[in-house]
Amino acid sequence: MIRIKPSTAKFNERAFNNFQKELGASLPIEYKKFLEKNNGGTPEGNIVELKNEEIKSFSVTDFFGINNMKINDLRSQYETYRERIPSRNIPICRAEGGNIVCLNIDNGLISLWDHDTELMDEDFLPANSCFKVASSLEEFLSFIKPYDHEDALDEYKVEDVWIDPDFLKELKSDKD
């Protein structure tokens, strides 16, 4: 499993129980244990690869915890996203690029919420904006692999480049 630097805020059992009451559901025990250990936190450089045509991979930047600073506080993030993500889901961590990883409070399913989908369609339905990532938190955590972005660039080389002819003309005219 990937290393996660725990939050400096300590897990608060009472605040966690109050949050569950607000949700009207008990969160999975494995999620509570994760919060007791890390209470959110920041993972090392990582990648989660998906078997999806639209989104191939993502990186987790921050996990949310109980009574953390507002930007990484579970309750605060839930209030921010509750109308945007599918119902019966809570945001558990932030992914690179503004997307959110969600935990379904009924079945423990982990999904990636793609914020771009709500910008593309006026008839947007939050239920259509998620991609399944894992069947449980434990499975999700096992999918997070260490990844060094700098080393990864060494593996790629440019094979072909296309420049819009109109853009090229504009660049040349700016030089003159």
Regions found by a protein language model. Name each.
Residues 113-145:
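Compact, glycine/acidic-enriched structural inserts
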Residues 1-100, 151-160, 165-176:
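A surface-exposed partner-binding patch
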Residues 93, 111-113:
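Residues in well-ordered beta-strands of folded domains
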